[in-house]
């Protein structure tokens, strides 16, 4: 990872990405750096490492990438709420179309134990798991030690708070919608 990042790195974050059989959430096309920049990072130097724990194939929501798209820099992202009401930043469709024409699209099929490294500007995403098999990845993000956030901690907290407030507002709207729908059914 240090060779890819060009400097000594530290683990910036990690998570388990699980897509349960028959559904699992959709991860719309995005660039990870779109989420890092508002947190004060000025350089898209974070390297993602996906360790595949299950077989990944066309049926169980494999990772989809636009190979080489990281060369485009940070693209325009739209602020949307997914089907679960979670706030997401997604690549503008006009940029997706342009990247598709220039770089193409690749479905990543992998076996358990395979590892994939990719740049935080690479366009990627995945769909629903439409199979009876789970799909799990361990994502480890490494960041060069020199790539420190320039914003103060209070600015980062403000960003996180505003994002959480948007999600709460959306949850309230969904609650009212379904409450009203349920009450109409009772009448």
What are these regions (language model features)?
Residues 32-34, 52-54, 68-70, 78, ...:
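Histidine- and/or cysteine-centered catalytic micro-motif in compact active-site loops
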